[in-house]
């Protein structure tokens, strides 16, 4: 069965376009019906980021869940990993995060978590999709069985304490000047507070959300402001989260970006030395740089690759018994602590290494020289540009040219109408030329289909 609503990370699209109040209400009803298992009183935790449309979607989902008899616990703006953690901690049947992650404010989305805090399997999402296309009028709760909604206080402190407990009790961040960019998103309160409680000298940017400025020239997808601020304030390190704080990148004292691949290298090497790696392996995606794979191999650590998407990384981690995984984009999953990517907890593990080694971040966090990698996105409106004969010819020619010297990865995004073209190889000029030819072919195919 093809999926109409769910992509690789829940349901996502333009607010009041795809993501309407009607859809949000129906998702609440459908998910509520699927997760009403057993005879106990059922409840759902709902969190959100700071987008203007979050109010609209939140209220619609409350109506949907309560109409099928589920109680709703509202936690307000909170990081996605916090919602996953709270779902399990509060013994809820279901968790919801209203967010479009790193997208701009015009978009929004709905992420769902099961009672143990894990994202839903494909099979469960299909069950919900089937109900979305049905009339649910005859499945609504009786008047006396409707759900209630209440706002929960103190959830920020719960997540702060949870994050702090991932570090040794005797470890302090005293003496470390940290600039943190919260992307004007869900972490704008909790992360600066947690860093301060751990003893860091904290400088915060991206902590003034207005409903419109989430991810706007800030956060993990736009680290330029953080790089400047780190240099300006002579900070030791910078931390950039995205709008829902499930991904992180970092910046060294020179203002140079440290991506997810480098963070995986730091954590994996440190955890192996400390005997904390469950297995001598790390899970990453096909997008991770070959330099990471070579570095880990030299450390006696295997790199297991998956399709793009943190859900696939987690699935492989669970299947293979690994406890460290992630993506170059900054989704870092440490399954000893959480059930999904947690940007802040990952950052704390890196800060712990920095404090332990007492060396500059530029020495600690740049563990390998990445191979030149070019990534370009081609947006399209209609059709299937990857099936175009001209595009296929360009891809074949590129693969032939890079044979033995690099690799190509061309894929459609699972969350937006974009084709991602990635080339990697030892000769940067050759890689750029190959990628540009494919991008031009995709652009022509997209224009022809419009």
Curated annotation (Swiss-Prot):
Active-site residues per Swiss-Prot or TrEMBL entry: 101
Annotated EC: 5.4.2.10
Keyword match GTP-binding: no
UniProt binding sites for Mg(2+): 101, 242, 244, 246
GO CC, alphabetical: cytosol
PTM sites of type Phosphoserine: 101
One MF term in the entry's GO annotations: magnesium ion binding
UniProt-listed CDD domains: GlmM (cd05802)
Free-text remark on how the cofactor is bound: Binds 1 Mg(2+) ion per subunit.
PANTHER family referenced in this protein's UniProt entry, alphabetically: PHOSPHOGLUCOMUTASE (ALPHA-D-GLUCOSE-1,6-BISPHOSPHATE-DEPENDENT) (PTHR42946:SF1), PHOSPHOHEXOSE MUTASE (PTHR42946)
Family of the protein in this entry: Belongs to the phosphohexose mutase family.
Protein name: Phosphoglucosamine mutase
Species the sequence originates in: Rhodopseudomonas palustris (strain BisB5)
High-level lineage: Bacteria, Pseudomonadati, Pseudomonadota, Alphaproteobacteria, Hyphomicrobiales
